Structures are given as structure tokens and as C-alpha cells.
């Protein structure tokens, strides 16, 4: 392979220049008590000591904030189901365009990111076809330019970057290790309107067959964006639920791998499937019978952008409908 034709800017220089110094917990010894930077702690480890804490303080610090989030996001403006590359890209754009919207992200896995921590066959590099490189520049991920496509040296670099930006957004909460077990519905002239999600701990959901009395929780939202990936134990969940509800006759069935056909189809097809439910990413392939694209990630990112665009078109209407 020829060397890369060009290399993108690794990050916006202004962002790097303005990054604040990292602050660590201050110790209590005479050498570490006044330390406010890493450099001030170096070489003084013999007398180092952390600030004291009681175990209940740790418990309350976690519990108080989590239950405040549960209370706050019980009524959300948008719920994104799935925190893979499509879902995270959707959240990033929504945060940029409408920072006022309160958005919960529900991720079944302990670790967000979906399949975007590695490239194909557990390899490191991530390939994106142009013009998805525009989003990499937007979030500050460096890449090698190979002409019609670009290569990020490790997929985890993209995923960790977009995740860090999303989690710093206002009005954003990620509930990981949490899965969507069902959809909240309301009657409408179209048959049904989606108005929220039914949630549970993922570990609880995995044991419904051998345990009982494990009812779920709920989040009301006028708009749900589902990006759970192709058919799998937790994948394509929302569209599979639409089939069992009778809102979709059957799944289209994902077709064989064709990168050129698949990526265009996924981005163009990202839309509101039924009122209140937008579907993007590989979950859409199960609705439309689209081809799979394999280890190229541009469609996931740009489907996220289009999902955000579709959401902004209908959110005001769906909010007015969501009064009960």
C-alpha cells in the first residue's frame, strides 16, 4: 500500500492549547497537602497521603447523583437507544444544534461504543469512506488520507473521542448497563405513536427466564431514536418490537455484504419509521432489507447525522402530541 497522501490535523490547536492542567486529589502531608498539579507531587511520594473519606460518602456521592438522574430523565425530550457510533454521532449533532433538549442515551452494555472499538476481524484500524472524513475533522480525530477513504489508526481513538465530547454536553445522561425491554405507545391516527421506552438493568433482563417479579422502569419521551445495530440478542430491538406489535409486517432481512450499495442506502434511508421512532444505522437494514457494509464505518456516522436532522424536523410536533 502506498503511504498516506495526507494527514488531517490531529486536533484543533486552540482546543489543545486551552486544555486545563489536570488536578488530582490533594494529600494531607506537608509535602502533598498544597499540591494542585501533577508536577508538584512528583518526587514527594514518601510523605504522600490522600484526603480522608468515609465509605458512606462514596456511596452517597454515587447514589444521590444517579437517583437524581433517574428522576430528572424520567421525562426526556429524546431517548437514544444504543450508544454505538451511530447513536453517539446523533447525540453529538443534537447537542450542537439544540443544547436545550434533554436527551437520555440507553446502552445495554457496560461499555458504550458498540462495535466501534475495533475495525474488522478484531483489527485496530478504522476505515471510513469519504465524505465521512468531514465528521472526523469536526470532532478532532486524526486520520490518514488514502484518496477515496481515510484510516483512523485505532478505532478506539474515534470512539473515545466522540464519547468524551458527548458526555460533556449539557442535558445529556448515559445510562449504560441498562437495556430497553419495550416501547411506550399511545394510540394515534397512524395506529400507534411511540412515546418513550421501558427499561431495566441488562443483567436483570438476561434472567427473566429463571427469575420472577422483575418489573421494569420507564422513561417518557416524545421521540425515540433507535440505533441498536443489526439483528442480535439485543440488536434491532425496536424494529423487532414493531413487528410483534403488528406495526411492521415483517423485517426486511439484512442482505449480503456490498459496501458500495449498503452505506448509501443506510444514510439515505434513516428516517422516522412510525410516529415517535426514528431508526438509523444497521438496525435500519433489518427494516429495509439493505445490504451490510462490513468493516467500514462512514455510514454509521453519517446515519447519525441524518437521524439528528430528522429528529429536529419532528421534535416540536411530537412534543405537542406528548401531553399525556
From Swiss-Prot:
Its EC number is 2.4.2.60. It catalyses: [ADP-thiazole synthase]-L-cysteine + glycine + NAD(+) = [ADP-thiazole synthase]-dehydroalanine + ADP-5-ethyl-4-methylthiazole-2-carboxylate + nicotinamide + 3 H2O + 2 H(+). It is found in: Cytoplasm; Nucleus. GO terms for cellular component: cytosol; nucleus. It comes from the Eukaryota. Belongs to the THI4 family. This is Thiamine thiazole synthase. The lineage of its organism: Eukaryota, Fungi, Dikarya, Ascomycota, Pezizomycotina.
Amino acid at each position: 500500500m502506498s503511504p498516506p497522501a495526507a494527514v488531517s490535523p490531529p486536533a484543533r490547536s486552540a482546543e489543545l492549547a486551552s486544555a486545563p492542567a489536570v488536578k488530582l486529589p490533594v494529600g494531607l502531608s506537608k509535602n502533598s497537602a498544597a499540591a494542585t498539579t501533577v508536577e508538584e507531587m512528583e518526587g514527594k511520594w514518601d510523605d504522600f497521603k490522600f484526603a480522608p473519606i468515609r465509605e458512606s460518602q462514596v456511596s452517597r456521592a454515587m447514589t444521590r447523583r444517579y437517583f437524581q438522574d433517574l428522576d430528572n430523565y424520567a421525562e426526556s425530550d429524546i431517548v437514544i437507544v444504543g450508544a454505538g457510533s451511530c447513536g453517539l454521532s446523533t447525540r453529538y449533532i443534537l447537542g450542537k444544534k439544540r443544547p436545550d433538549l434533554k436527551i437520555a442515551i440507553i446502552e445495554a452494555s457496560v461499555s458504550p461504543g458498540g462495535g466501534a472499538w475495533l475495525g474488522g476481524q478484531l483489527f485496530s484500524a478504522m476505515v471510513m469512506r469519504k465524505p465521512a472524513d468531514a465528521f472526523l475533522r469536526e470532532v478532532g480525530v486524526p486520520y490518514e488520507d488514502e484518496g477515496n477513504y481515510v484510516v483512523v489508526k485505532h478505532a478506539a481513538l474515534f470512539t473515545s473521542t466522540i464519547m468524551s465530547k458527548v458526555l460533556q454536553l449539557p442535558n445529556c445522561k448515559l445510562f449504560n448497563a441498562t437495556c430497553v425491554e419495550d416501547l411506550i405507545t399511545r394510540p394515534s391516527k397512524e395506529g400507534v405513536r411511540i412515546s418513550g421506552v421501558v427499561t431495566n438493568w441488562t443483567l436483570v433482563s438476561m434472567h427473566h427466564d429463571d427469575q420472577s417479579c422483575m418489573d421494569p422502569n420507564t422513561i417518557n419521551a416524545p421521540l425515540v431514536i433507535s440505533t441498536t445495530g443489526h439483528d442480535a440478542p439485543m440488536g434491532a430491538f425496536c424494529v423487532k418490537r414493531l413487528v410483534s406489535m403488528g406495526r411492521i409486517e415483517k423485517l426486511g432481512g439484512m442482505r449480503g455484504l456490498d459496501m458500495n450499495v449498503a452505506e448509501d442506502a443506510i444514510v439515505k434511508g434513516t428516517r422516522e419509521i412510525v410516529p415517535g421512532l426514528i431508526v438509523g444505522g444497521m438496525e435500519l437494514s433489518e427494516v429495509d432489507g439493505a445490504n451490510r457494509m462490513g468493516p467500514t464505518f462512514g455510514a454509521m456516522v453519517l446515519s447519525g447525522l441524518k437521524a439528528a436532522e430528522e429528529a429536529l424536523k419532528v421534535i416540536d410536533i411530537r412534543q405537542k402530541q406528548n401531553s399525556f
